[in-house]
From Swiss-Prot:
HAMAP family: RNase_P_2 (MF_00755)
Disulfide bridges in this chain: none
Source species, domain of life: Archaea
Protein name: Ribonuclease P protein component 2
Organism in which the protein naturally occurs: Sulfurisphaera tokodaii (strain DSM 16993 / JCM 10545 / NBRC 100140 / 7)
MF annotations from Gene Ontology: ribonuclease P activity
Amino acid sequence: MVIFSYRTRIIYIKKIKNKRDTRAKRYVIFDIISEDNFEIREIEEAVRNSVKELGGKIWLDLSNPKVIMIYNNRGIISTNRIGYKIIIASLPLIKKIKNKEVLLVPRRTTGSLKRAKRLIGIE
């Protein structure tokens, strides 16, 4: 139990033991529609810029998107349970990467990396 006091006011806050972990991972699977090939860091930079443009620096820090892998014009973005919705909302905002036209289409969200790999065609 945590106790905060401010002069005459006292606030009691109980920690809930069975509360779900808010840092649980989520994996967003997306399609890359483009004639060109891109590196992982180029796509990650574009995703981070679009999240920052849509939600600001706070949502960028909360969601912390990372592109894990790309395979056959499909990719996986790792994020947490708090920020996966802003990533899904910001993917269609990406129109160009390195002055080449591209469209990123979110397909599915899953909770395990193994399932995400299976959905993009690995294993």
